[in-house]
Design a protein with these regions (language model features):
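Acidic/polar loop patches that form or flank catalytic/metal-binding clefts of enzymes
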Residues: 19, 172-173, 291-294, 335-336, ...
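N-terminal leader/propeptide and maturation segments of large enzyme subunits in energy/redox metabolism
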Residues: 97-119, 288-331, 523-620, 660, ...
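Active-site phosphate/pyrophosphate-binding segments
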Residues: 281, 302-424
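N-terminal export/assembly segments and adjacent metallocofactor-ligating motifs
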Residues: 2-290, 331, 539-542, 698, ...
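Long, contiguous, secondary-structure-rich segments that constitute the structural scaffold
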Residues: 533-583, 671, 677-691, 695-818
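Extended redox/cofactor-interaction regions of prokaryotic respiratory oxidoreductases
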Residues: 156-240, 244-246, 250-251, 275-279, ...
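Short beta-alpha connecting loops at secondary-structure transitions
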Residues: 263-268, 502, 515-526, 677
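Flexible glycine/proline-rich, aromatic-decorated loop/lid segments
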Residues: 257, 485-519
């Protein structure tokens, strides 16, 4: 039996990655080929796998089924990253920069020149020294926001931070794009970020939960990939959820994969209005007397300071369900029925991260925590709340044992300045201006030099055109990348880095279960002139006299063995490094006690002996610290703030009638894999899909499969229409992560022909509290388009002096032997 690509992909959201070598080859030949094939263990953000290598080439990828319970199709696309035409093959420098002319305005427009490694390294080192001399190390911006580049210890952002900190430091980022609004608030409200904390075990939810409210959480989609190496066991747990008969309610403008799998009741909330719905439900619970007064008194602080606002005594607006209905477009009775359902059953609220990536995103988790406190089930088995069930297999029981850590970045040296992660464009555009962050004021320095290793600023920063305009103001941009990403094309100096398949590394299995260590063995030799990030930064360190400090005279393999030596596997299980490396992984057993874990249980049992790390040791419904900041858009208790850009803005919606959301991708992690064959599964005419409802398709006169222009004041993109009943009217969804492809780089705001959604998203900060990203607060319009320009996102730029392997063949074929 053969496996067609269609058959393979029909296996759906998970699919199997264990496709056998072709059965059409005769037995004898197959045996010979098999004997010449190496099976090398490796691991990725998509799962652990074996690369089958023959004659130095990857011929197949199969999942490590003992480690990956439900493999994803994405694992099989990893081989394509090695051989793709978009590889950076050798060091390259932008033409005008190499000629000493600078011309930052030509970034992304002109050709590159192939240079030697020494030339590129010397140019980069000289640019760093020039910036240091001109403005000190505050003139250097380490933009290596690349924690998701791969799951190994040698992450490019760590290696970059280590290098800069040993030469005096650099401007870096505070907070993050994922949870920039919620994390800093939660630490004050409940004494923990919560978004990365171990969740109540699946076993406890299966045994005790009667109602699960998915407030935007899409467990099935987002658990396909992980920060570390996923085991995908959570999908087996979800099957048990179904068998347990848990009633699931989904509050989301999209009827997600998870909603469909659980046959959830779908509440089609208007994007950006979630806090209003929570306020309405809390108002109803209070007035009906159905809230848990005892829990509030014993375990929380400041409800009495929040209550006047909830009842409208401070602002004249009673936050009733009728009030909330006008904002959310959710019927008041639906909210009241849901509140009744939640207080009368053991209920678990699964929050998500997308809601807080919106204007006033700081309010979302705080409001969920307050609602959960009024329900009174926090700390009970199967009850309470969790903000990480959709991440890293949240709910998996933890081994409690040490796996492997990473390299140290060291201290920041003379410079220890950080800016909120999403303020990248402002940092460059607004030197000398200030930004607030968690009660402090930060002054932007004048940045001249920027380095990005393994990251994708043009992939993750909202308002791409604003960012590109900023990047063209810098003196020098250096990028370390295996591929000609949109960010690499905007650089002055580009170093070709290896993919993980071309170097050794070591990784841990799942942030929560923490039950495996993986050998990420080198599978094939580095392609072309690529070097691994560790070697590149070592060569740069040589030019600053810090090489010995950077490497400590250790090779990559030395570091890997050293990291492994501190693990439970080595210290307690006595498994030698050689044995581990040969086998490819080590597995820890999960203790049965871990399957009984209930988040916040110890606090509930004895809040005096087990206080939260907050101002009062309790849940802070009101925080004196927050109130002391005196911000006009963030106060001492959770509040509803109306967004500037949403469907409730009656004037703006006349021009841009669709609310655009940008969920995580189904077949990528952010921008990763967008240059591989797996993207053909869902692209529409080579563009990123835009999902709209049948009513909106009719309203705009577009059909399924057509390409449309999506636009607002920030820019425009091409996207392929997918008409679906799984999205509410008035909302459009374009998954984030497509590679940027400007149609005409000479224009100030060129149309993106690939469908990169961040061309359209707003860089408006959430509030003065965290200045985090509000990328889900956007309005757009769409229109039909007849003439389509090509999507060139994956094409390398023109490179002078480049040598194409095909050139030799062409020359030979043209030689005439007389």
């Amino acid at each position: 039996m053969t496996n067609s690509r269609r058959d393979f992909l029909k296996k759906g959201a998970l699919g199997t990655a264990a496709i056998a070598l072709s059965g059409s080859t005769s037995g004898a030949v197959a045996g010979i080929l098999e004997s010449r094939t190496q099976k090398i263990p490796h691991a990725s953000h998509f799962g652990a796998f074996y690369a089958h290598v023959r004659d130095g080439k990857i011929v197949d990828i199969t999942s490590q089924l003992d480690s990956d319970a439900n493999p994803t199709v994405m694992t099989r696309a990893l081989a394509d990253r090695v051989t793709t035409d978009s590889r950076v093959k050798y060091p390259a420098v932008r033409k005008s920069y190499l000629e000493g002319k600078g011309r930052g305005d030509l970034r992304g427009k002109e050709e590159f020149v192939r240079v030697s490694w020494d030339t590129a390294l010397d140019l980069a080192a000289n640019a760093i020294k020039k910036a240091q001399k001109s403005g000190g190390n505050e003139a250097i911006y380490n933009a290596s926001y690349s924690v998701w580049s791969h799951p190994g210890a040698f992450k490019p952002n760590v290696l970059a931070g280590r290098f800069f900190n040993q030469i005096g430091g650099a401007v870096a980022t505070a907070g993050e794009y994922s949870n920039g609004a919620a994390g800093p608030v939660n630490t004050t409200v409940v004494g923990d970020m919560e978004v990365y904390s171990i969740q109540t075990a699946h076993e406890q939810i299966i045994a005790n939960t009667k109602v699960m409210v998915l407030w935007g959480a899409d467990l099935y989609k987002t658990n396909r990939g992980g920060y570390s190496v996923p085991n995908h066991r959570c999908y087996d747990a979800y099957e048990e959820y179904k068998k347990a008969g848990i009633k699931v309610v989904l509050i989301d403008p999209i009827y997600t994969t998870t909603g469909q799998e659980f046959k959830a009741d779908w509440i089609k909330i208007r994007p950006g209005s979630d806090v209003a719905m929570m306020m309405g439900m809390m108002n109803y619970l209070y007035k009906s007397g159905k809230y848990d007064k005892e829990f509030l008194e014993k375990y929380t602080h400041g409800f009495d300071q929040f209550l006047p606002y909830l009842l409208g005594k401070t602002d004249g607006i009673d936050k009733t369900t009728a009030w909330a209905e006008k904002l959310t477009e959710v019927p008041a009775k639906t909210m009241e029925d849901l509140a009744d359902l939640m207080v009368s059953n053991r209920t678990f609220i699964a929050g998500n991260w997308a809601m807080q990536r919106a204007e006033h995103g700081e309010q979302v988790d705080w409001s969920i925590i307050t609602l959960a406190s009024m329900i009174g089930q926090v700390g009970l088995a199967g009850g309470g709340f969790g903000f990480s069930m959709h991440y890293e297999g949240g709910g998996d029981a933890a081994s409690g044992k040490r796996t492997v850590g990473g390299l140290s970045q060291g201290k920041g040296g003379a410079v220890n300045l950080t800016i909120p992660a999403s303020r990248m464009s402002d940092l460059i555009n607004k030197p000398g201006q200030t930004v607030s962050y968690k009660g402090k004021t930060i002054t932007y320095p004048k940045v001249e030099f920027m380095l990005s290793a393994g990251g994708s600023p043009i992939g993750h920063q909202p308002n791409v055109n604003e960012l590109i305009e900023a990047m063209r103001k810098l003196d020098t941009i250096v990028v370390l990348e295996p591929w000609w990403t949109p960010t690499a094309k905007m650089a002055d100096i580009v170093f070709p880095a290896t993919t993980t398949l071309e170097r050794d590394d070591i990784a841990s299995g799942m942030s929560y279960s923490n039950d495996r260590i993986y050998a990420m063995k080198q599978v094939v030799k580095p392609a072309y002139e690529a070097k691994d990030d560790y070697e590149i930064f070592t060569l740069l360190a040589q030019r600053f006299g810090t090489e010995k400090k950077y490497t400590r005279d250790r090779s990559v393999k030395d570091w890997i063995e050293g990291l492994y030596s501190k693990s439970y596997a080595k210290r307690e299980m006595n498994i030698s490094f050689e044995e581990f490396w040969e086998k490819g992984s080590v597995h820890y057993e999960i203790p049965e006690e871990a399957r009984k874990f209930v988040r916040h249980e110890e606090f509930r049992k004895d809040p005096v002996s087990n206080p939260l790390k907050t101002e009062t040791g309790k849940i802070q419904i009101f925080s004196d610290k927050f109130a002391s900041y005196n911000y006009d858009d963030f106060k001492g208790h959770p509040m509803w703030f109306e967004p500037k850009e949403w469907l409730g803005n009656k004037e703006l919606v006349k021009k841009y009638p669709l609310h655009l959301v940008s969920p995580h991708p189904t077949y990528r992690i952010h921008t990763q894999l967008d240059n591989t064959w797996v993207q053909n599964v869902h692209k529409v005419q080579g563009r990123e899909p835009i999902r709209i409802s049948p009513n909106d398709a009719k309203k705009f006169g577009v059909r399924d499969g057509e390409v449309v222009e999506v636009y607002n004041d920030r820019g425009s993109i091409l996207a392929g229409v997918v008409v679906t009943n799984t999205i509410r009217d008035g909302v459009a969804a374009i998954e984030e992560g497509a590679w940027y492809s400007p149609e005409d780089s000479s224009q100030k705001r060129p149309r993106c022909n690939s469908g990169q959604v961040n061309v359209l998203t707003s860089s408006r900060p959430t509030s003065q509290m965290t200045n985090a990203t509000s990328a889900n607060s956007n309005l757009v319009a769409i229109r039909k388009i007849d003439v389509l320009s090509p999507n060139l996102a994956y094409n390398p730029p023109k490179i002078k002096g480049a040598w194409d392997e095909n050139d030799f063949t062409k020359i030979i074929n043209n030689i005439s032997y007389n």
